[in-house]
Amino acid sequence: MEQFHGTTILSVRRGDKVALGGDGQVTLGNIVMKGGARKVRRIYNNQVLVGFAGGTADAFSLLDRFEAKLEKHQGNLTRAAVELAKDWRTDRLLRRLEAMLIAADATTTLVITGNGDVLDPEGGICAIGSGGSYAQAAARALAENTDLSPREIVEKALGIAGDMCIYTNHNRIIETIE
């Protein structure tokens, strides 16, 4: 049975500001099932931004576990991410989940994968999902050549990804921490 897939999630950090955004498209095979899904959330007392790509049910399961890890480790983003990645890699049921997460707080941005990777992106820019490469390339160009805010960069870069990737639409949700 096919899973719901297809999205673009992008995070841009500049100075003490971070923006995390995503599109709203959910795709089952080659059919758009929903255009307004919310794949970017605020968790842990609105102090942490999380965006997810991949299988929708898998992502929600991981998001719940990640929020529990944040509670357990008093909001320590890195520790919670490492603990989630360890569980994800070693637990037989979790290992089958197909999703990726980007998490950001006031000081740190991390990409968390099912391979047990917890990555701190270079240059404060990272993206996941089907349109991630397009969005990341656009964001890097905008960050290097303009004085736009992280929110403005995310908005423009997701627009470019939406123009190029058939699994990404222009219905964007963007959250910021300043």
Swiss-Prot record:
Protein name stated in the entry: ATP-dependent protease subunit HslV
Subcellular location: Cytoplasm
Source superkingdom: Bacteria
Chain residues that bind Na(+): 162, 165, 168
Enzyme class: hydrolase
Stated regulation of activity: Allosterically activated by HslU binding.
Keywords, alphabetical: Allosteric enzyme, Cytoplasm, Hydrolase, Metal-binding, Protease, Sodium, Threonine protease
Signal peptide limits: none
